[in-house]
C-alpha cells in the first residue's frame, strides 16, 4: 500500500515534466511545435531525459519517507547523492545535453520532503484526496532546514576556484543563486507567487489557458538564470517587462497563443530561453496535481 501511494506521487512529478514540455507555444523553450532557442535539444530529447529520471523520482520520495526522522542535513545528503546519480543518468540519455539539471535538483528536494511529510501524516497516505494547499506549504517549509547551508557551502568559496560551472559563474558575475537560492528559501517563489496565481487562474479559465497564463506570469517575475546567462541582465529585464505588458492586455486564449508564438520568434532571434520560468512551471504543476487543481 505504502509503495503504491509513493509510486503514484512520483508519477505526478514525471507528469509535471511532461505537461511542462508539452505546453505550447512557449517562447524560447522546447515544446511540441519547435525547439525554441535551443539548437542542441528537441521535444524527444526531453522525453529521453524524463524516462532516465523517472526511477530516481521514485527513489527520492521513498528516501524521504524512509528517513523522515533523520536530521535534515543527513536527509539532504542522501537526496543529493541520489540526485547526482540521476544527473549522470540524464546526461547519458541525452548525450551530454542539459535538459533537467536544475529541475532534477529541485525535484529531489521536493519529492524527498513530500515523502518525509507523508511519513508524519498517515491520514494522507490513506486518502490523498485530502491533500490541500496547507500540505503544499508544509512540504516546502521542510526544505528550508535541509538547505540553509547551501549558499555558503556551495558558493561561499568560489574566490579560490579558476573554473566555474554555469551556476557558479552566474553567482560570481551577477549574484544569481539559481535553484540553490530557491531551495534555501523554501521555494517561496513557488508558494507565495506561482501557486496562488495558478489557483486563481484555474478557477476562472480552462486548464490550457491557465497554464499559458502561468507561464507568462512566471516569465514576468522569475530571477531567470537561463535568460541572464544567455543575454545578460538587460535582456532578462526586457523579457520581464514584455511579459508584464502581455499580462495587462488580458488577451483571449486565441490571441494569447498568437502573441506567444510571435514572441517565441523574438526570443529565438536573440537566442534567449527562460529556463528558470520553465522549471518553476513544472514544480507548480506537481503541486497542482497533488492539490487536484489539474
Swiss-Prot record:
The record's listing under InterPro entries reads: CitG, TriPribosyl-deP-CoA_syn_CitG
Q: Which residues form a coiled coil?
A: none
**What keywords sit in the KW lines?**
ATP-binding, Nucleotide-binding, Transferase
Q: Name one Pfam family in it.
A: CitG
Which EC number(s) does UniProt give? 2.4.2.52
Which GO terms are recorded in the biological process aspect for this UniProt protein? prosthetic group biosynthetic process
Domain of life per record: Bacteria
Entry's Gene Ontology molecular function annotations: ATP binding; triphosphoribosyl-dephospho-CoA synthase activity
Catalytic function, reaction form: 3'-dephospho-CoA + ATP = 2'-(5''-triphospho-alpha-D-ribosyl)-3'-dephospho-CoA + adenine
Task: Name the Gene3D superfamilies on file.
Answer: Triphosphoribosyl-dephospho-CoA protein
Q: What HAMAP family does the database record attribute to this sequence? A: CitG (MF_00397)
Q: What family does this belong to?
A: Belongs to the CitG/MdcB family.
Q: This chain belongs to which protein, by name?
A: Probable 2-(5''-triphosphoribosyl)-3'-dephosphocoenzyme-A synthase
Source species, please? Streptococcus pyogenes serotype M2 (strain MGAS10270)
